[in-house]
Amino acid sequence: MIKTDLTVLAVDDDIINLKLLKSMLLKSGYVKEVIEAKNGSDAIGILKNRDDIDLILLDIIMPIMNGIEMLNVVRADDNLRQVPIVVLTTDETKKAEALECGANSFLMKPIRGDELVQKIKSVIV
């Protein structure tokens, strides 16, 4: 049975995308808190200071530290590697690279609320 009090870290450099994700997640009935980060570097800082993140939604193309770089850092860290990561992208070619780097799954943008809920259910056990 899936938890209904998830804490999700949403990582995207586009503020509008972050707001839409947050709205969809909070309306899903499964998420109690959405933490936002504008790049991979900020997200790593959040992950190092919190131990309650249940899921990461990660954009690939971002400044400072992109999604692939962040995936590599997270998967190399013994304390973080177990956190499920769903990659969000508009670039079909980035899916395979993200999965090879340790992403659990992916969603193509633009994201629909029903797809997001199904993806959450599939990666959170």
Question: Positions of the model-derived regions?
Answer:
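Hydrophobic/aromatic residues positioned on beta-strands within the core alpha/beta folds
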Residues: V86-L88
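Two-component/phosphorelay signaling modules centered on CheY-like receiver
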Residues: I15-I35
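Active-site residues of response regulator receiver
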Residues: D59
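Alpha4 helix (beta4-alpha4-beta5 surface) of REC/receiver domains from two-component response regulators
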Residues: E69, D91-S105
